[in-house]
Amino acid sequence: MKCQTCHLPLQLDPSLEGLSLTQRNLLLSNNSIITATNENVISNKGIEAADNCGPQIPKERLRRLGEIQNIKDLNLKDDKLITDSFVFLNHDDDDNANITSNSREDQRYGNANGNDNKKANSDTSDGTSTFRDHDEEEQEATDEDENQQIQLNSKTLSTQVNAMTNVFNILSSQTNIDFPICQDCCNILINRLKSEYDDAIKERDTYAQFLSKLESQNKEISESNKEKQYSHNLSEKENLKKEEERLLDQLLRLEMTDDDLDGELVRLQEKKVQLENEKLQKLSDQNLMDLNNIQFNKNLQSLKLQYELSLNQLDKLRKINIFNATFKISHSGPFATINGLRLGSIPESVVPWKEINAALGQLILLLATINKNLKINLVDYELQPMGSFSKIKKRMVNSVEYNNSTTNAPGDWLILPVYYDENFNLGRIFRKETKFDKSLETTLEIISEITRQLSTIASSYSSQTLTTSQDESSMNNANDVENSTSILELPYIMNKDKINGLSVKLHGSSPNLEWTTAMKFLLTNVKWLLAFSSNLLSKSITLSPTVNYNDKTISGN
């Protein structure tokens, strides 16, 4: 073991070795009694010094308390008592070993006596039994006792250490000192406790002197001072009563004021709640108004965007040339095309008459559309677009024309089919002019008449622009428009049945390159006519024509 203060190894006092359970309990109980007694003595002495009238400890008890010796001064006998409990305990191994050895000796001797009795009985009954060797039994018993004693001695040392450790732990838990401690540490501890005890005694004496001084001062008060004090107390009592009445009146006034303030507070709280409700209502109305404004602004912005989109769409629609979008005139190799239909045929690439008739039907439909939209009055002609079987009605000019015609039309009108009839016709054999050739010639006449009337319409638009313009810039623009749109000149000259010197008549023969080229020139003039008509139709005569009049060929889309 080690000292719990300086941590140096310790050698236990011989009196602490081999303690029985009863001795250890007595040691622990004495320590607790001494501690409690010392505390009671110190407290009783302090009470006695503070109050002489309190209960006192008899002197006989104090004398007996002073005669109590320290546990180290006790000369305890190291007797191995056999009065322990029947339960085998680790710290009573020595006693149990003695009890066990004694019981075994008694048992051995008892067995020997029993055997002797049995032997005597057997000798008297049988006469043939043998006697045991007593020396061998005693030797075996002695060997067993020695072995058990060695085991008990080795077990007793660890048991004593554990027992003393438990004792020291219990002592440490009951006091403020950690056990075990060495002799030097114990002396230092005793000196420290003595100094603390002396300081406590001095402090107790100081308080006792102060208490006795106060008691002596209280006894020195005379009767006269008491009477003066009594009269003074009476006057003070009257003053206090008056002050009490005054304070009661003031309290009543304050209570009334408090009631008024409570009522005012309730009224103000109600007004506060009302104002908060009004504020919340205003905020709600304002939020609703803001929400409506936001929704209105969104709708307005949406309408503006829709309006701008509609304007843009309208501008796009205005810029769209309905004639160009509806009638797409282009070319495909040596052939001129209208809406993808080839107008013409050559031996190297034969085009069926159905496709040629359909292209001519589209051409008649285009001319009829221009006449209708621009309100062109063709007095001597009437277009009848009927697809691949379109016709032209021509007014009869003289009787010769009427006599040569085989059609008995009502009135003075001659109906000319603008399609090639593949049925047998006698005129084809003699290479004479057919009604199909006459219809193509009439088509050239109609295009020339439309060109003349469009030039007249453009001139009238130019004169109206000049009269309505007020500033110089607009007049200049009008002059430019007049120069550019008043006169329509087609790229290829048309004269009777020829266009640019090429005849449009077949005279019953099959289409050839010359006729195909003439049809190409025809569609080119019609495309120019279409562009000019688009400008007039859109009322935008200040814009330049969509087709360059210097270009005399059909450009592809």
Curated annotation (Swiss-Prot):
UniProt keyword annotations, A-Z: Autophagy, Coiled coil, Endosome, Membrane, Phosphoprotein, Protein transport, Transport, Vacuole
Organism superkingdom: Eukaryota
GO process annotations (BP): autophagosome assembly; autophagy; cellular response to nitrogen starvation; cellular response to potassium ion starvation; cytoplasm to vacuole targeting by the Cvt pathway; late endosome to vacuole transport; macroautophagy; mitophagy
InterPro entries tied to this protein: Atg6/Beclin, Atg6/Beclin_C_sf, Atg6/beclin_CC, Atg6_BARA
Pfam (any one): APG6_N
Topology of this chain in the membrane: Peripheral membrane protein
Subcellular location as annotated: Endosome membrane; Vacuole membrane; Preautophagosomal structure membrane
Record's compositionally biased regions (Acidic residues): 135-147
GO cellular component, as recorded: cytoplasm; cytosol; endosome membrane; fungal-type vacuole membrane; Golgi membrane; phagophore assembly site; phagophore assembly site membrane; phosphatidylinositol 3-kinase complex, class III, type I
Signal peptide positions (record): none
GO molecular function: phosphatidylinositol 3-kinase binding; protein-macromolecule adaptor activity
Main localization, broad class: membrane
Sequence positions bearing Phosphothreonine: T142
Region (Required for membrane-association, autophagic function during starvation and normal autophagosome morphology): 515-540
Coiled-coil zones: 189-322
Annotated segments matching region Disordered: 93-149, 218-238
Misc. remarks from the entry: Present with 2490 molecules/cell in log phase SD medium.
Known partners and oligomeric status: Component of the autophagy-specific VPS34 PI3-kinase complex I composed of VPS15, VPS30, VPS34, ATG14 and ATG38; and of the VPS34 PI3-kinase complex II composed of VPS15, VPS30, VPS34 and VPS38.
The record's note on its domains: The C-terminal domain called the BARA domain is dispensable for the construction of both VPS34 PI3-kinase complexes, but is specifically required for autophagy through the targeting of complex I to the pre-autophagosomal structure.
Protein family per UniProt: Belongs to the beclin family.
Protein name: Vacuolar protein sorting-associated protein 30
Lineage: Eukaryota, Fungi, Dikarya, Ascomycota, Saccharomycotina
Gene field: VPS30
